[in-house]
Amino acid sequence: MPRFVDRVVIHTRAGSGGNGCASVHREKFKPLGGPDGGNGGRGGSVVFVVDPQVHTLLDFHFRPHVTAASGKQGMGSNRDGAAGADLEVKVPDGTVVLDDNGRLLADLVGAGTRFEAAAGGRGGLGNAALASRARKAPGFALLGEPGQARDLTLELKTVADVGLVGFPSAGKSSLVSVISAAKPKIADYPFTTLVPNLGVVAAGGHSFIVADVPGLIPGASQGRGLGLDFLRHIERCAVLVHVVDCATAEPGRDPISDIDALEAELAAYQPTLQGDAVLDDLAERPRAVVLNKIDVPEARELAEFVEDELAQRGWPVFLVSTVTRENLQPLIFGLWQMVSEYNAARPQAAPRRPVIRPVPVDDSGFDVQADGHGGFVVTGARPERWIGQTNFDNDEAVGYLADRLARLGVEEELLRLGAKPGCAVTIGEMTFDWEPQTPAGGHVAMSGRGTDVRLERSDRVGAAERKAARRQRRERDDD
C-alpha cells in the first residue's frame, strides 16, 4: 500500500442550488394573500485549505471523489431554503492545483491558504421574488443552478529551503540523518529512498528545512528512474546541493562528470512553477557541492583533487563524512548563510490586487449562429443559465423564459438572421421548435405573465363607492 502520494487526480463537484417554491399565502379572511414562495438555498462549494498537519495526498488516492452538499428547497411563508455547507478539504502545504489541461490554478503555500475548487450553484428564486407590478401572482418558481464540477490534478511540491540532489547511493539520506533528527531508510543498494525525506536543521538560533530527493540518473527529466516523479520537490528550494559519492567504484564515474550529468537533468526539467515572480528558474538557484565519504582514504584524495576545479565555478565546496561527522558544522552554517542571502535578495510576493473586468457596453451577452441544417444555436452565459433554471413542465415558466429571451434580444436576432417559425433553436442542452411570440415580430409589446384577474377587478364596494351611492340617493329624495 502506498504511504506517500504526491500526485493525484480528483473529481470535485459542488452542491447544486435548491429550487424555489411556488406557493400562495393562505390566511383566514385574506382570500388574496399573494405569492409567498421562498428562494432555494445556495449549494455548498468545495474549498481546499492548507493544513500543516497533513503531509501527503494519500487520502485522495483512495477517495478521489469530493462532493459538497446541495442547498435546500424554498418553502411557503417566505421561508428560504438552507444553504449547503461548504466542504473544506485539507491539503498539505505546498500543494499545486492544475486543471485538466495542465494549467496552473493555484499554488497553496502557508497554513490556512484557501482556494475554491468548485463553486456552488445559486438557489432558484421563489414566486414571491418573481412577483412584480406586471406579474403579481406567478404560478411558478425557478430551479436551482447545478454546482460546478471539474477534474483537478493535485501535485505536492515540498516546501524546503535546501534540496539534496545526487546519484543513487551518494549518501543523501545519510547526510539528512546526521544533520537533523530525521530517520530515513538507509541501505547499501541504489534507490533505497523512494519518497522525499524532510529534516529540520538547527544552525545556532536559526533553522532551515532540508529535502532529500530520491537518486537521479541520466534521463531523469524524460522519465527514467524515479527522477521525473520527484524533481518537482526541489522547485521551491532556495539552494540546491550536489551530493557526490567520492568513493564510488563504478567505471566512468567521477565527481565532475556526476555534477555535469545532474546539471544537464536540472536544465532539461520543466518545472510547473516556472516563471513565478518570486522563484527563480532552477538554473539560477545558488548551488553548493558536498564531496561525501572522505572517511575513505581514496575518496579524500579524489575530493581534494577536484575541490579547486569545482570552486572555480563559484560554488561553495564542502568535504564531509557522514560516518565520522567531519566538517558537518561548517556545512550547516554555510548552507544557512546561502539560504538567508537568497531569501533576502529575492523579491517578496506582491499582494494580489483585485481586478475588475466590466462587461463591454456593446456586449449583448449572447451570440446566435446558424447550425447549417436550417436551425440556430444560441450561446451565452445568461441564456444557458436561464435554460437550466426553467421548469419546462410549467407553461407559465416557459412563457417567462420566452419573455426573458425576448427582452435580451434573442428573438430579434433570430428574426434578423431569417429564422422561420418551427425551426430548431438550441440553447445549452435544450433544443426546441421556435415560435415567435407575436406574428408581427419582436417589436410588439408583450403582455405580462403571471397576472391574476382577481387582483385586477374586484366586486367589493369600497368607501368611495358607498359615499357616491349615498349622494345619489339624497339627490333622488330631493327631487
Curated annotation (Swiss-Prot):
Residue ranges, compositional bias (Basic and acidic residues): 451-467
One annotated GO molecular function: GTPase activity
Family annotation (PANTHER family): DEVELOPMENTALLY REGULATED GTP-BINDING PROTEIN-RELATED, MITOCHONDRIAL RIBOSOME-ASSOCIATED GTPASE 2
Keywords: Cytoplasm, GTP-binding, Hydrolase, Magnesium, Metal-binding, Nucleotide-binding
A biological-process GO annotation: ribosome biogenesis
Region named Disordered: 438-479
Binding positions (GTP): 166-173, 191-195, 212-215, 292-295, 321-323
Any Pfam family hit: GTP1_OBG
Cofactor requirement: Mg(2+)
Protein EC: 3.6.5.-
Function: An essential GTPase which binds GTP, GDP and possibly (p)ppGpp with moderate affinity, with high nucleotide exchange rates and a fairly low GTP hydrolysis rate. Plays a role in control of the cell cycle, stress response, ribosome biogenesis and in those bacteria that undergo differentiation, in morphogenesis control.
Stated name of the protein: GTPase Obg
Principal location: cytoplasm
EC class name: hydrolase
HAMAP family the UniProt entry points to: GTPase_Obg
Domain OCT: 358-436
Quaternary state and interactors: Monomer.
SUPFAM superfamilies in UniProt: Obg GTP-binding protein C-terminal domain (SSF102741), Obg GTP-binding protein N-terminal domain (SSF82051), P-loop containing nucleoside triphosphate hydrolases (SSF52540)
Location of this chain's protein in the cell: Cytoplasm
Recorded superkingdom: Bacteria
Phylogenetic lineage: Bacteria, Bacillati, Actinomycetota, Actinomycetes, Mycobacteriales
4Fe-4S listed as a keyword: no
